[in-house]
Amino acid sequence: MYKAITEDDRRQAIIQKMIFQEIRRLDQSALMSLLKNKEGRWFLMRMLDATGINSNSFTGNSTTFFNEGKRQVGLELLGRISELGIDAVKLKQKAELEYIEHQLRARELAVEYTDKKEGSIE
């Protein structure tokens, strides 16, 4: 912990700690609100996808560093969800299931559409 040299330093350290705690509280509240909302869960999953969290980041060139930076953002977000506790983790899992279901349904619709198009050409 930071040890104050002067009274002003001590006061500044207390102020910084209080600001940090308030920002953390607001971040946690916002993240939980996001997880409790279906559209928020969708957005969360889109952002996690954008970070490449479940992808191989190695390219064999300097793009690897960029990809790892994006991936680190996703890992940070997952860590913050875990810090919120079991309810947040369950909501994240719900988001993952909703996301997979949506992707499967979109694929089904695309296959149906292309099958109809191919059938109408004949």
Segments (PLM) and residue ranges:
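Intrinsic-disorder/low-complexity detector
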Residues: 1-122
